[in-house]
């Protein structure tokens, strides 16, 4: 009767033989890819408006998605406007018009005034 073949011992969960997922074949750790988000800026604005209020990570994820969505919409509309006018550069004028087209009534007015204020502050600091 043939003897049963023994396989190599399986390393236990916490053993040193288990290979770390973040390690390459040569033993060096891989650098984690950086995830860009607006969370730092959302948090700064939150603290300006409501200093005693916090935000959950789920809510921060939603806010990040919202900012990305609005950014893409404005950029797309500004790009279209530049193309219609046979321009190769998106200026603050295209951005302002895109905001007026995308945002409703009073919200557009406030966004335009805040944007103008931010551009003025930026140009004066140069």
Swiss-Prot record:
List the glycosylation sites.
113
Species of provenance: Homo sapiens
Query: Where are the Dimethylated arginine residues found in this chain?
Result: 80
Q: Which residues carry this modification: N6-(beta-hydroxybutyryl)lysine?
A: 6, 12, 17, 21, 35, 86, 117, 121
PTM sites of type N6-acetyllysine: 6, 12-13, 16-17, 21, 24, 86
Q: Which GO terms describe its molecular function?
A: DNA binding; protein heterodimerization activity; structural constituent of chromatin
Name under which the protein is recorded: Histone H2B type 1-M
Give the modified residues of type ADP-ribosylserine: 7
Upper lineage ranks? Eukaryota, Metazoa, Chordata, Craniata, Vertebrata
- From the record, give the cysteines joined by S-S bonds: none
PTM text: Monoubiquitination at Lys-35 (H2BK34Ub) by the MSL1/MSL2 dimer is required for histone H3 'Lys-4' (H3K4me) and 'Lys-79' (H3K79me) methylation and transcription activation at specific gene loci, such as HOXA9 and MEIS1 loci. Similarly, monoubiquitination at Lys-121 (H2BK120Ub) by the RNF20/40 complex gives a specific tag for epigenetic transcriptional activation and is also prerequisite for histone H3 'Lys-4' and 'Lys-79' methylation. It also functions cooperatively with the FACT dimer to stimulate elongation by RNA polymerase II.
Tell me which residues bear N6-butyryllysine.
Answer: 6, 21
Which processes are annotated in GO (biological process)?
A: nucleosome assembly
Function, as annotated, reads:
Core component of nucleosome. Nucleosomes wrap and compact DNA into chromatin, limiting DNA accessibility to the cellular machineries which require DNA as a template. Histones thereby play a central role in transcription regulation, DNA repair, DNA replication and chromosomal stability. DNA accessibility is regulated via a complex set of post-translational modifications of histones, also called histone code, and nucleosome remodeling.
- List residues of cross-link (Glycyl lysine isopeptide (Lys-Gly) (interchain with G-Cter in SUMO2)): 6, 21
CDD domains from the xrefs? Answer: HFD_H2B
Family membership noted in the UniProt record:
Belongs to the histone H2B family.
- Subunit structure of this chain's protein: The nucleosome is a histone octamer containing two molecules each of H2A, H2B, H3 and H4 assembled in one H3-H4 heterotetramer and two H2A-H2B heterodimers. The octamer wraps approximately 147 bp of DNA.
> Which positions does the record annotate as the modified residue N6-glutaryllysine?
17, 35, 44, 47, 109, 117, 121
Keyword Cell cycle among UniProt keywords: no
An annotated GO cellular component: cytosol
Residues that bear N6-crotonyllysine: 6, 12-13, 16-17, 21, 24, 35
> N6-succinyllysine is carried by which residues?
35, 117, 121
Give all PolyADP-ribosyl glutamic acid modified positions. 36
Q: Major location, coarse class?
A: nucleus
In the record, Phosphoserine modifications are located at 15, 37
